[in-house]
From Swiss-Prot:
GO terms of biological process kind: 'de novo' CTP biosynthetic process; pyrimidine nucleobase biosynthetic process
UniProt-annotated catalytic positions: C380 (nucleophile), H515, E517
Quaternary organization: Homotetramer.
Family label: Belongs to the CTP synthase family.
Pfam families noted in UniProt: CTP_synth_N, GATase
Name the record gives this protein: CTP synthase
Positions with a binding annotation for ATP: S14, L15, G16, K17, G18, L19, D71, R238, D239, A240
Reactions accelerated catalytically: UTP + L-glutamine + ATP + H2O = CTP + L-glutamate + ADP + phosphate + 2 H(+); L-glutamine + H2O = L-glutamate + NH4(+); UTP + NH4(+) + ATP = CTP + ADP + phosphate + 2 H(+)
Coiled-coil stretches: none
Organism for this UniProt entry: Rhodopseudomonas palustris (strain BisA53)
């Protein structure tokens, strides 16, 4: 039977509960345990799919097509276990399910209340389908005291009494601020946070204390005394230069040992952290550097590109180099020459996005990369803009554009239900590749034998990658574009959907309709990112 670890946060938001959960999951996994990580989000949205990147950051897409919180990306990257739609739930989803049942009459006329109906639904989600795991780590979004989080805290309070004694522990992540004028760390915010937690019936077993310096013994003693935890359960979570240093740092601080002790489990030797040691050695001692320009629409909110940043880092780890990122707002290139911004970079990456804003700037970035032989990686929207650039400037299709931006005579890119066959509007069925207006989750792609991308993947002819897009490149223009060197080297197995394009004769120019960053791991870098950074190294004359 699975044991449950609930991770809560206090004092301030953005302390890194997701990272702490992922690092602890990696430590338990390194000890031979099977772990599952889940996230409870208290917001009323059904999922983050329609939320602004500036509000929420990245939408992480799972193999089964769920649009989830970016913390699930941390879970996957640290444990290697693919997340599913069953690993993330929101208040909105809980209420939708309850109200659907109420309309059907499932509650037999009962008055629907937060307790017990909402809390029971949360508990059912938490304990569902966990028999195959030794530990289930459950992160509660937000901080203690947030009004929208109260049903979740009540549910995890109840669940300790529902399950056998000793099967549940609580870890509280908190902040120990340093006050320079006083010359000391302050424990009072943590004491008040724990007091708030205890007022709703939850006594933390372990305090995970974010700090920028070592915690003195006297402060540890004070936290243990006033927060009612053992002094050994006050764990120091020092700021780290790299997130991939966190598992080893938490182990050195004794977190995994303390978790096992809280469950009454005897520790059997040291966890196998060799792969983390290798990763951190490469991060700390790179053999060179490359600079990659990310030409995007949401560069003011770096979390909107969280998986992308990490995947570039993984490419650097694979090639033993440090990857520096130049953030460039794509709208800049609509009024200015891109050369001063891009001449010094070793690679250009144009990521996904929605809407017309900044699109022409991304097209200019693709043109610069093509003309100057700079490695170019276009992802989703970035591939579409590269195709439009080729159509306009190589194939002579001056009006080439995307129907996402309005009506156009030359729809190089269109909504996946808009394609014309002859003069007739073609409607796709839900059973086909183009069901609905959003293509979500893992789909296969057939690679052209002998293509660069096939070689990058290890000479395979079929791959599976995750998608999140409404618009697609129009295959009606395929032959005209290929005549000018833009090769369609990957298609859906039925040949309907373009998945990958590449230029023949260019050092490295690849566009993909999918999101490879979602499947990259520090210990298993995605081959496209490893190859892209390798090409950037060649461009910088490092190799």
């Amino acid at each position: 039977m699975a044991r449950y670890i609930f991770i809560t946060g206090g004092v301030v938001s953005s302390l890194g509960k997701g990272l702490a959960s992922a690092a602890l999951g990696a430590l338990l996994q390194a000890r031979g345990y099977k772990v599952r990580l889940r996230k409870l989000d208290p917001y009323l949205n059904l999922d983050p799919g329609t939320m602004s990147p500036y509000q929420h950051g990245e939408v992480f897409v799972t193999d089964d097509g769920a649009e989830t919180d970016l913390d699930l990306g941390h879970y996957e990257r640290f444990t290697g276990r693919p997340a599913t739609r069953a690993d993330n739930i929101t208040t909105g989803r809980i209420y939708q399910d309850i109200l659907t049942k109420e309309r059907r009459g499932d509650y037999l006329g009962a008055t629907i209340q937060v307790v017990p109906h909402v809390t029971n639904a949360i508990k059912e989600f938490i304990v569902d389908s966990n028999d195959a795991y030794d530990f289930v780590l459950v992160e509660i979004g937000g901080t203690v005291g947030d009004i929208e989080g109260l049903p979740f805290f009540e549910a995890i309070r109840q669940i300790k009494n529902d399950l056998p004694r000793g099967d549940v522990i609580y870890i509280h992540l908190t902040l120990l601020p340093y006050i320079p004028s006083a010359g000391e760390l302050k424990t009072k915010p943590t004491q008040h946070s724990v007091k708030e937690l205890r007022s709703i019936g939850i006594q933390p077993d372990i305090l995970l204390c974010r700090t920028d310096r070592s915690i003195p013994k006297e402060e540890r003693r004070k936290l243990g005394l006033f927060c009612n935890v053992r002094e050994s359960a006050v764990i120091e979570a020092r700021d780290a230069d790299s997130i991939y240093a966190v598992p080893e740092a938490y182990h050195a601080a004794g977190l995994d040992e303390e978790v096992l002790a809280a469950f009454g489990i005897a520790s059997k030797g040291e966890p196998g952290l060799d792969r983390w040691t290798v990763i951190n050695e490469r991060i700390r001692n790179p053999e060179g550097e490359v600079t990659i320009a990310i030409v995007g629409k949401y560069t003011g909110m770096k979390d909107a590109y969280k998986s992308l940043i990490e995947a570039l880092s993984h490419g650097g780890i694979a090639n033993k180099v440090k990857v520096n990122i130049d953030w460039i707002e794509s709208e800049v290139f609509e009024n200015e020459d891109p050369a001063p911004f891009l001449e010094h970079v070793n690679g250009i990456l144009v990521p996904g996005g929605f809407g017309q804003r900044g699109a022409e700037g991304k097209i200019e970035a693709a043109r610069f990369a093509r003309e100057r032989n700079v490695p170019y990686f276009g992802i989703c929207f970035g591939m579409q803009m590269a195709v439009i650039e080729a159509a306009r400037n190589l194939a002579g299709i001056a009006d080439a554009n995307s129907t996402e931006f309005g009506p156009t005579k030359e729809p190089l890119v269109g909504l996946m239900t808009e394609w014309l066959r002859g003069n007739q509007l073609e409607k796709r069925s839900n059973a086909g590749d183009l069901g609905g207006t959003m293509r979500l989750g893992a789909y296969p792609a057939a690679l052209k034998r002998g293509s660069r991308v096939s070689q990058i993947y290890g000479d395979v002819l079929e791959i599976s990658e995750r998608h999140r897009h409404r618009y697609e490149v129009n295959t009606a223009y395929k032959d005209r574009l290929e005549q000018h060197g833009l090769r369609f080297s990957g298609l859906s197995p039925d040949g309907v959907l373009p998945e990958i394009v590449e230029y023949e004769g260019h050092p490295w120019f690849i566009g993909v309709q999918f999101h490879p960053e979602l499947k990259s791991r520090p210990f298993e870098p995605h081959p496209l990112f490893a190859s892209f950074i390798e090409a950037a190294m060649a461009q910088s004359r490092l190799v």
